[in-house]
Amino acid sequence: MGRSPCCEKAHTNKGAWTKEEDQRLINYIRAHGEGCWRSLPKAAGLLRCGKSCRLRWINYLRPDLKRGNFTEEEDEIIIKLHSLLGNKWSLIAGALPGRTDNEIKNYWNTHIKRKLVSRGIDPQTHRSLNSATTTATATPTVNNSCLDFRTSPSNSKNICMPTTDNNNNSSSSTDDTKCNSSTTEESQSLITPPPKEEEKSVPLVDLELSLGLPSQSQCNKSVSLNSSSSGFYDLFRPPAKVAQRMCVCKWTLGLQKGEQFCNCQSFNGFYRYC
């Protein structure tokens, strides 16, 4: 539901007011006062709507209206109030008796704007035009720069090395450690890993191959190795004691039991015929 019209507009006049209409409106208001603007046109004998009668009276027919041009004092008041209130022309008109809001608005758009521009002042912000242009050009354009740390060669780490004071043993525990900042490459070069136990226990394997039995020097080498690898080299060691000397000549030459041994020389538990 919209607002109801102020009057029936079917049989109302539109356009400029005539002098006869102005005089009828003045005479009625002087005799009866303003009253209700919706019923006033019919009572005054005017073929106008109530809104048209109200605007005609306030803006043109009031007896307290000032006629003529605006003074310099009124111009300064309008400029000061506009800088504070903006385009609230009805409030500005309240500070200027005899001036209407419509009159002040028209005067602002036709005269005061040009006056402010000639002074180098922006009519909207009431600031100097030069400062407005300089601030607009002086604002730097900040570009969003992204830093990519994914391809950095080495990531920095903080390595805390405990340090003790020989002179003062009663220092606080918070001062016992000092942190040194270094890269991963430097820390790896400074700290050498301890040798693994597997590398210590694994013996060196002799790769010299021979068809015969191992010699006495090779046996001495095997004895000097770690005890943990002795079981592995027991397979290559000759027996410590030979139960009995055995001569091949006993069977080949037909020597009997109890006869004198031959001239064979023993070599590592076996006999070689001379």
Curated annotation (Swiss-Prot):
Q: Which GO terms describe its cellular component?
A: nucleus
Where is the region Disordered?
157-201
Give start-end positions of Low complexity composition bias. Answer: 163-184
Indicate the segments forming the HTH myb-type domain, all copies.
9-61, 62-116
Q: What are the subcellular locations of this protein?
A: Nucleus
| One Pfam family named in its UniProt record | Myb_DNA-binding
Q: In which tissues is it expressed?
A: Expressed in flowers and weakly in roots and stems.
Kindly list the GO molecular function terms attached to this UniProt entry. Answer: DNA binding
Keyword annotations from UniProtKB, A to Z: DNA-binding, Nucleus, Repeat, Transcription, Transcription regulation
DNA bind region: 37-61, 89-112
Say what the protein does: Transcription factor.
Q: What is this protein called?
A: Myb-related protein 330
Origin organism is Antirrhinum majus (Garden snapdragon)
Taxonomy, top ranks, is:
Eukaryota, Viridiplantae, Streptophyta, Embryophyta, Tracheophyta
